[in-house]
């Protein structure tokens, strides 16, 4: 059973278009990338396509050095015509991710990577929560109630696993959350009891059908290349017994819609200042 993420993405896009009708300023998103590979370039092009389809101005800045990246981020943070800043990841080896994240104006941090926004998340403020975690929670709350449910998150990254756990623990959601990682023993015995499973480990087909109970909701965050094709972290046979987000066309699609929605919200906030 496949979860229809396209309808959720469309719903967010419609919210964005409504915001744009009242914006006096045209929203602008600037994406930064340093020495990008073909995968990054492809993703940024899809981001650009989505932005333009919604009427959001989009600019990609391809940089050659860390110093240029830092300088350009600072300039964009100060530029009143820019409403959202995106920095493509992973960054090249040796670059301090937190150092880069701190340079982004917290109010233009549409990815939710700035440590200040991470801190706000603990107190339930999700305006700039990490965008992929936001997409995961949006999908879940669109298809089921999470209150009291046993949720297992596989992966403890700062962009998905940890923030998703915090968001699902929030009092108005009140899920019971278990986070598994590379040192967790006997993961199958844990996932078999879960009502909801979120998988973000970057390993194609990591979650098998025999690790999932019937009627569970499974959110596949993974994007991997397997035999020349895009594959998720979840074995496709899982959809025979559970509800599963597709890859591609699942979490990634909703995440991009979340990003654009934040740019539009920022522009509308600027109008009211």
Curated annotation (Swiss-Prot):
GO cellular component, one term: cytosol
Function according to Swiss-Prot or TrEMBL: Catalyzes the oxidation of 5,10-methylenetetrahydrofolate to 5,10-methenyltetrahydrofolate and then the hydrolysis of 5,10-methenyltetrahydrofolate to 10-formyltetrahydrofolate.
Record GO biological process: L-histidine biosynthetic process; methionine biosynthetic process; purine nucleotide biosynthetic process; tetrahydrofolate interconversion
HAMAP family: THF_DHG_CYH
Keywords noted in UniProt: Amino-acid biosynthesis, Histidine biosynthesis, Hydrolase, Methionine biosynthesis, Multifunctional enzyme, NADP, One-carbon metabolism, Oxidoreductase, Purine biosynthesis
Similarity section: Belongs to the tetrahydrofolate dehydrogenase/cyclohydrolase family.
Protein's pathway: One-carbon metabolism; tetrahydrofolate interconversion
Subunit structure: Homodimer.
Keyword Isomerase included in the entry's annotation: no
Catalytic activity annotation: (6R)-5,10-methylene-5,6,7,8-tetrahydrofolate + NADP(+) = (6R)-5,10-methenyltetrahydrofolate + NADPH; (6R)-5,10-methenyltetrahydrofolate + H2O = (6R)-10-formyltetrahydrofolate + H(+)
Name by which UniProt lists this protein: Bifunctional protein FolD
InterPro entries, per the entry: Aminoacid_DH-like_N_sf, NAD(P)-bd_dom_sf, THF_DH/CycHdrlase, THF_DH/CycHdrlase_cat_dom, THF_DH/CycHdrlase_NAD-bd_dom
E.C. numbers: 1.5.1.5, 3.5.4.9
Matching Gene3D superfamilies: Leucine Dehydrogenase, chain A, domain 1, NAD(P)-binding Rossmann-like Domain
Binding site for NADP(+): 155-157, 182, 223
GO molecular-function term, one example from the UniProt record: methylenetetrahydrofolate dehydrogenase (NADP+) activity
């Amino acid at each position: 059973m496949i979860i229809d993420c396209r309808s959720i993405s469309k719903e967010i896009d419609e919210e964005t278009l409504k915001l744009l009708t009242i914006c006096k300023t045209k929203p602008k998103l600037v994406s930064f990338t340093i020495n990008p590979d073909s995968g990054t370039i492809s993703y940024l092009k899809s981001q650009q396509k989505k932005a333009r389809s919604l009427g959001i101005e989009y600019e990609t800045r391809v940089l050659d050095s860390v110093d240029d990246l830092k300088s350009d981020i600072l300039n964009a943070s100060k530029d009143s015509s820019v409403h959202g800043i995106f920095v493509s990841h992973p960054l090249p080896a040796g670059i301090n991710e937190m150092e880069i994240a701190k340079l982004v104006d917290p109010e233009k941090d549409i990815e939710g990577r700035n440590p200040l926004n991470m801190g706000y998340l603990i107190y339930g403020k999700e305006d700039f929560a990490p965008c992929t975690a936001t997409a995961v929670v949006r999908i879940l709350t669109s298809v089921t109630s999470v209150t009291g449910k046993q949720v297992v998150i596989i992966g403890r990254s700062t962009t998905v696993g940890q923030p998703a756990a915090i968001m699902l623990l929030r009092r108005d959601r009140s899920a019971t959350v278990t986070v598994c990682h590379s040192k967790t023993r006997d993961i199958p015995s844990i996932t078999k009891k879960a009502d909801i499973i979120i998988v973000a480990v970057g390993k194609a087909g990591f979650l098998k059908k025999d690790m999932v109970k019937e009627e569970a909701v499974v959110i596949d965050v993974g994007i991997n290349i397997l035999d020349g094709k895009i594959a998720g972290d979840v074995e496709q046979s899982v959809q025979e017994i559970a509800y599963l987000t597709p890859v591609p066309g699942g979490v990634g699609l909703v995440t991009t819609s979340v990003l654009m929605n934040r740019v539009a919200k920022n522009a509308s906030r600027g109008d009211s200042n």
